[in-house]
Amino acid sequence: MKTFVLHIFIFALVAFASASRDSAKKIGSQYDNYETCLTEHGLTDDDIFSIGEVSSGQHKTNHEDTELHKNGCVMQCMLEKDGLMSGADYDEEKMREDYIKETGAQPGDQRIEALNACMQETKDMEDKCDKSLILVACVLAAEVVLADSSEGA
């Protein structure tokens, strides 16, 4: 069973290194709890943002706040079902471990630093849904930047 880290991400997590390159794919759609979380929140695949929209930040300008919140709730649901989040709180160590397992990142890897920065940026947010989507978006955006910088090097 795959775990979701922002899995991103990671989801969201996450969705993270290889998935971020498939921009038409829906965030989180490759993970086991995706369909369950869609059903629990009364959403369909059509309601979920694409990886490309999220990694580019277009989801923030192309969608209403209610759509952003609903997408975040699906992300939070998957993170929680995978033991990476409880309510609005991350299990940071488990999130790092699962992200490393998912991406193959090694200690000192810039992707891990990006995940840490994204968790730090969102850790004090109280709304679990908004927090989850912002975390996933942060990780996906960082992966794009890191991929672009490594291609240019």
UniProtKB/Swiss-Prot annotation:
GO terms for cellular component: extracellular space. It is found in: Secreted. It holds the Pfam family PBP_GOBP. One of its GO terms (molecular function) is pheromone binding. Disulfide bonds join 37-77, 73-129, 118-138. Colony queen number, a major feature of social organization, is associated with worker genotype for Gp-9. Colonies are headed by either a single reproductive queen (monogyne form) or multiple queens (polygyne form). Differences in worker Gp-9 genotypes between social forms may cause differences in workers' abilities to recognize queens and regulate their numbers. This is Pheromone-binding protein Gp-9.
